[in-house]
Every structure is written in C-alpha cells, then in structure tokens.
C-alpha cells in the first residue's frame, strides 16, 4: 500500500476517456461513507471481487439488472472492466424493476452509456462502478490477521427531477 508504484491516475489511464463521460469532478456525495468488516484475508475479497464468475450467485440483484449481457474484460495496465446493459425487460427484483422504470430517458451520457453498468477495478482492491445515474467508489484493505474491510461512497450529479430521485 506504500511504495513507488504507479499512481492510480496512471493505472486507470486506459479507463480515463470512459470515466470522464460521467463528469465525476461535478458530482456530490449522495450518501454517507460506508464500511464493512470481514473475518477473512483481504486477498480473498480482492480475488472474489475481481472474478466475474461469482456475479450470478454472489450478486443476484446486479445479475438480475444486467443479465446475460454481463461480460468481463482483462485489459492492459493492470485494470479490468466488467459491464452489462441494463435490461429494460421484466426483473425478478422489484427494486430493479422500479429502478429501470423510473430511470429518466434523458441523459447527458452518450447513448452507448445511458443504460450500461460498468465496473472498473485494479489490484489491490480499488473499484469505480458507473451507473447511468451515479457512481460508487470503494476499496478493500487488510485491518489485521484474517481481518479485512471494504469502504466506499456513492456520488452523483445534482438532479432534482422526481424520476431521478426515485431511481436513486
């Protein structure tokens, strides 16, 4: 966690063009910072979090949202990208159905990103998740022997439209 490795900006250079579409510099926090603690080695969390095969069983709500369009990409420069198109069809989760039904159609994002979920990550455990209406940033880290934590926060552009408030 300390050392002379490349900066996060350099590692995420490949992601810069896509991430910049989301106007992160203009976003504000939309929730309080969160932390979860686990009784396991932090490398276990990072390994599982970076392997897409766990998504259908480990993240049933995300899988319900993006379904079979979910894909993982391993890219150069130590980053990976997962993505899926947010399905406009019927969802098992009522929360997902409500999200899809209320997410405004008008967006500052290009059409290619208006209904896409994107997950950029790099070792050790730093993640930027992009939704059409918000982003989430989190990281995983050790806090002791066989003890780990994950901490993050969500951000969004100011948007007073009732549909956007409902979607969020």
Predicted regions and their residues:
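C-terminal catalytic domain of Rieske-type non-heme iron oxygenases
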Residues: 1-168
């Amino acid at each position: 966690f300390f050392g002379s490795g490349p900066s996060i900006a350099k590692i995420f250079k490949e992601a810069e063009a896509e991430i910049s579409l989301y106007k992160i510099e203009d976003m504000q926090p939309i929730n309080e910072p969160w932390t979860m603690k686990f009784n396991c080695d932090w490398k276990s969390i990072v390994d599982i979090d970076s392997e897409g095969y766990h998504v259908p069983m480990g993240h049933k709500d995300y899988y319900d949202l993006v379904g079979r369009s979910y894909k993982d990409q391993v890219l150069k420069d130590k980053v990976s990208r997962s993505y899926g198109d947010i399905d406009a069809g019927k969802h098992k989760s009522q929360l997902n159905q409500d999200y899809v039904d209320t997410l405004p159609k008008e967006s500052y994002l290009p059409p290619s990103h208006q209904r896409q979920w994107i997950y950029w990550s790099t070792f050790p455990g730093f993640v930027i998740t992009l939704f059409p209406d918000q982003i989430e940033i989190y990281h995983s880290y050790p806090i002791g022997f066989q003890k780990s934590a994950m901490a993050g926060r969500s951000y969004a552009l100011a948007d007073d439209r009732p549909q956007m408030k409902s979607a969020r």
